[in-house]
UniProtKB/Swiss-Prot annotation:
Pathway: Metabolic intermediate biosynthesis; chorismate biosynthesis; chorismate from D-erythrose 4-phosphate and phosphoenolpyruvate: step 5/7
Pfam family name, one: SKI
Subunit text: Monomer.
A GO cellular component entry from the record: cytoplasm
Subcellular location: Cytoplasm
The keyword Cytoplasm is annotated on this UniProt entry: yes
Enzyme superclass (EC): transferase
Function comment: Catalyzes the specific phosphorylation of the 3-hydroxyl group of shikimic acid using ATP as a cosubstrate.
Organism from which the protein derives: Gloeobacter violaceus (strain ATCC 29082 / PCC 7421)
Single biological process term from Gene Ontology: amino acid biosynthetic process
E.C. numbers: 2.7.1.71
Residues the record lists as binding Mg(2+): 18
Name the record gives this protein: Shikimate kinase
Encoding gene (name): aroK
Length: 177
């Protein structure tokens, strides 16, 4: 279907990018890359540790450099970090493939991230609901630049199937005369 073109999943933390990404990679016969996990492997530090000790700017720079390396490859499903869309230069890397926004409402996101205390540095301390609303407010217009938008409110297998359906429809549109 994608003829080797990589797939980049964007969206808020808790939207299911990593879980859905693994399912999509399996269905497409692609490799899977979790960008945050790769950043941890390259840096030897947890994402939260980078945020805490070195700051978000250092993390975002590292994220861009790792994304640049990954974008040189094909036949990958890449689960990006929620803030990857914030840096303009990252869009150049993302557009080496097809960009899919896994979109979920705040209540769905909150329900998912509440089960992962301590793993979301941008939600540390304070009201998680309010912080998610703020982050989505900052990022929604950027996520909307994706090639395809898919509701991520369902269970991961259903979201993966819907993603494939939406991709097929979009690719059919693009190839129509």
């Amino acid at each position: 279907m994608l003829k080797g073109v990589s797939l980049y999943l964007v969206g808020m933390m808790g939207s299911g990018k990593s879980t859905v990404g693994r399912l999509l990679a399996e269905k497409l016969g692609y490799g899977f890359v979790d960008l945050d996990a790769l950043i941890e492997q390259v840096s030897g530090k947890r994402v939260g540790e980078i945020f805490e000790r070195e700051g978000e700017a250092v993390f975002r720079d590292l994220e861009s450099r790792v994304l640049a390396e990954v974008s040189a490859y094909t036949r990958l499903v890449v689960a990006t970090g929620g803030g990857v869309v914030l840096a303009r230069r990252n869009w150049g890397y993302l557009h080496h493939g097809v960009v899919v926004w896994l979109d979920a409402d705040i209540e769905t996101l909150l329900g998912r991230v509440e089960h992962e205390p301590g793993t979301r540095p941008l939600l540390a301390g304070g009201d998680r609901h309010l912080r998610l609303v703020e982050l989505l407010g900052e990022r929604a217009r950027l996520y909307a630049q994706a090639d395809v938008r898919v509701s991520a409110a369902g269970l991961p297998p259903a979201v993966a199937e819907e993603t494939l359906r939406c991709l097929a429809a979009r690719l059919a549109e693009d190839s129509a005369p």
